[in-house]
Amino acid sequence: DMLVLNAGVFPGGKKIEALTDEEWHRVMAVNLDSNLTLLRETHPLLKAAPKYGRVVVIGSKNVPAPGPGAAAYSASKAALTQLARVAALEWGADAIRINLVHPNAVFDTGIWTPEVLAQRAAHYGMTVDDYKRNNVLHEEVTSRDVAELIAEMCGALFAKITGAQIPIDGGNERVI
């Protein structure tokens, strides 16, 4: 009776003029199309849930605040967000709640190798530790933080909420 849509890829930064059709379509296939398939195929199961169905969609900080070099990723996450919002409207009558989380960078995942972290921090003239905490609260957001929020969103606290979009980013100045 719960589904977390977390399928996604973040390709290396590429400006629009350098983005190939193959790269664009791959990102859309993973970040959008696969999640549409999962939603569609699980609808009967979610609808039959004893109490109510729950879906949490992993969006991105890039929906409200995209960055240069992330056109395919940002567009795919924006489209996924709209898909989730429409599903919340359409499936509410089936007692299915659909909400989204929009994390900023979560550094304890496989995407963020020590080399990538060092490069990004150097690009902004920061240490790696400062880069990880580059938000209003000066706190690193971890995969555990995101998982705990998702667990809450599948619980009683969110039983009467659908279509919500919750940032988990330590307070991103570009989003606030």
Give the ranges of each region predicted by the language model.
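Short C-terminal tail/terminal secondary-structure segment
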Residues: F10-G13, F158, T162-I176
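Substrate-binding pocket helix/loop in short-chain dehydrogenase/reductase
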Residues: K14-I16, E23-M28, L117
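Active-site loop immediately N-terminal to the catalytic Tyr-X3-Lys motif
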Residues: I16-E17, A65-A71, A93, H138, ...
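Active-site helix of classical SDR
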Residues: L39, S76, A84
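Alpha-helical segment proximal to the catalytic Tyr-Lys
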Residues: P44, L89-E90, A159
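Residue(s) in the substrate-gating loop at a strand-loop-helix junction
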Residues: S60
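Short, small/polar-rich loop/turn modules that mediate ligand/substrate recognition or access, typified
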Residues: G92, R97, I161-G163
